[in-house]
Design a protein with these regions (language model features):
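Catalytic cores of nucleotide-sugar-dependent glycosyltransferases that transfer UDP/GDP/TDP-activated
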Residues: 1-220
Length: 220
């Protein structure tokens, strides 16, 4: 509810555009306050990409044809918003396939940024993954800031797009988000060397386990 949570546009950040495949898309940043908590939540918006009745699939359950573009827009938009605010942070925690490009971008396109190159990156994979509906054209769309499609090789396997496995290759820590993961993802995690992994944690234990994991990772 926009009125209840006082959701409104951050006007001073308006005017930013995200380029995808040579097309410009305006990035609208909104903020809301959670009742009873001293916490603000920021939202990235674009009417063409996100003003829909369903999130990732249409009413027949078919993934939207522009999910590739929406993902690139979201991932780059998150990073550019952090840069715009100048937020220093100890870590950034990315959840699911929709954020899979963020660890990659932070370790490549933005690796020399003085604000972003100090983050510890944590990635949480889930069972849900729509990589199978992505096309090789995704590599061109995701090649931002002088990156080349070849730089995204970790996101390809046997000519198929593998979003989650790609993200895992650029993370500093992993927290499993589902009790059951795809076998290929489980194998990819086991192959990683020196990356701390927190197995799936039930909701009632999540706060304690996650904080311990965060603190241990930051101290390393």
């Amino acid at each position: 509810n926009e009125r209840r949570h006082r959701l409104h546009e951050v006007v001073r950040l308006s005017g930013m555009n995200i380029i995808i495949d040579d097309d410009d898309y305006p990035l609208i940043i909104k903020v809301a306050s959670l009742p009873g908590m001293r916490l603000q939540v920021y939202f990235l918006d674009n009417e063409e990409f996100f003003k829909r009745k369903f999130m990732f699939h249409d009413e027949e359950g078919k993934p939207f044809a522009d999910n590739e573009d929406r993902m690139v827009f979201f991932c780059k938009g998150v990073i550019e918003t952090i840069r715009k605010f100048g937020w220093p942070a100890d870590y950034i925690h990315c959840f699911g396939w929709m954020t899979a490009l963020i660890p990659f971008y932070l370790k490549t396109a933005y690796k020399n940024d003085p604000i972003l190159n100090k983050f510890k990156i944590i990635y949480t994979p889930y069972k849900e993954d729509i990589s199978g509906f992505f096309t090789p054209k995704f590599l061109d769309k995701a090649s931002i800031n002088n990156l080349e499609p070849e730089d995204l090789k970790p996101f390809m396997k046997n000519k198929d797009v593998t979003l989650i496995e790609g993200a895992l290759a650029f993370t500093d820590g992993i927290i499993i988000g589902s009790e059951d993961l795809d076998e290929s993802v489980t194998k990819a995690i086991k192959k990683l060397k020196g990356i701390p992994v927190l197995d799936y944690v039930p909701l009632e234990n999540m706060k304690k386990e996650y904080m311990e994991f965060y603190n241990k990772l930051i101290e390393e």
